[in-house]
Amino acid sequence: MSNILMTLAEERELTTPDHFAVKLKVDDGDCYDFSDELQALGHEVFFANWDDLKGREFTRMFHDNAKAFIKPPPLSTMDLIFVYKMEGFYFDLPRFFQMVETFAAAAPLVVNDPRTIRHNIDKRYLLELEREGLLVPPTRLFDETVRERLAKGEPIVLKPINGERGKGVMLMKTPAELDAIEGHEHEYLAQDFIPGVREGERSFVFLGFEYQFGFLKRPSNPEEFRCNESQGGTAVLYEPTAEEMEFALRTLRTYESFGCPIHYSRIDMIRSERGPMLMEAELINPSIFARYFDRGEDFGKKIAAYFHGLLKS
């Protein structure tokens, strides 16, 4: 029997003494699917709100087997820590990194791996993948060529180097629009705008290198280019073509070659005239939309089996 801790975004107003309320109802279902399956395999499962980490220990912890809040056991007693649903961590990166380092020092297994988290949180990984030959939208650090290209009528997408769920991503069409980020230009990557993104992103979920399921994310309206759920995007089930599957696996293999272990991931791509084009490799706590497709229970079994295998190996 192993101890497994999951960090979750909590809806404190809805939490009761015998129920840890996850921020979104859809996520609540996913989290409990994982937990039920892990318990069926003989593991002890604990939930914690990352806001409750003080120093190197949590001040509150929910023991899901017992359906009760308990005195938090030391993190050193955890065999696996799953950095899962977390709200707003991009707005407090120093504390987030401190948490990840605390987990790495305390537990033999952290998913996703701290090395992968540290690397993936910086969107400049897209430049590295591009250098390795993967097709991505032409990407560069913000420089004066951005203003020059906008003056020529070429739209540019600005993407925060540290950001999540499409927040802060902007489509710029004129130099005057750059006033919105004046003084913060160094915090952005600049990408060529690829019109094909309006057709939607193809997203594929993996555990390790094993494909789980895929879905097509679409923007909320013809004028929107972001497909993120937080921006009103929708999703439908979608199965990858052979070319898309090979591209996704190549992306993961390339990322692993950077010294970043691969566990739980989502690879986002679009179609282009040159073939699949990578938009993001989500390797921190990717949204998987499982409940939207009634895949929560099935995926819960698979992720529980995956964690069980990690703990046995």
Roles of regions detected by a PLM:
Residues 2-17, 24-31, 98-200, 242-245, ...:
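Active-site nucleotide/adenylate-binding loops and adjacent lid/helix of ATP-dependent enzymes
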Residues 76, 134, 152, 260, ...:
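Structured loop/turn residues at beta-strand edges in well-structured enzyme cores
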Residues 84, 142, 217:
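Conserved residues at the C-terminal ends of beta-strands
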Residues 51, 86, 161, 193-194, ...:
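Anionic group-transfer/hydrolysis microenvironments
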Residues 23-138:
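Conserved N-proximal alpha/beta basic substrate-recognition cap immediately N-terminal to
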